[in-house]
UniProtKB/Swiss-Prot annotation:
Annotated family: Belongs to the gastrin/cholecystokinin family.
Keywords: Amphibian defense peptide, Antimicrobial, Secreted
A single Gene Ontology CC term: extracellular region
Name of this protein: Caerulein precursor fragment R8
Tissues where this protein is expressed: Expressed by the skin glands.
Compartment(s) where it occurs, according to its Swiss-Prot or TrEMBL record: Secreted
GO biological process: one example: defense response
Function statement: Antimicrobial peptide.
Top-rank lineage group of the source organism: Eukaryota
């Protein structure tokens, strides 16, 4: 449901933020 969507969005945002801040090797 909507909570599942929010969870996925949050995880995606965290992954993107980590990539931008930490320069993670994975694209």
């Amino acid at each position: 449901g909507f909570a599942s969507f929010l969870g996925k969005a949050l995880k995606a945002a965290l992954k993107i933020g980590a990539n931008m801040l930490g320069g993670a090797p994975q694209q």
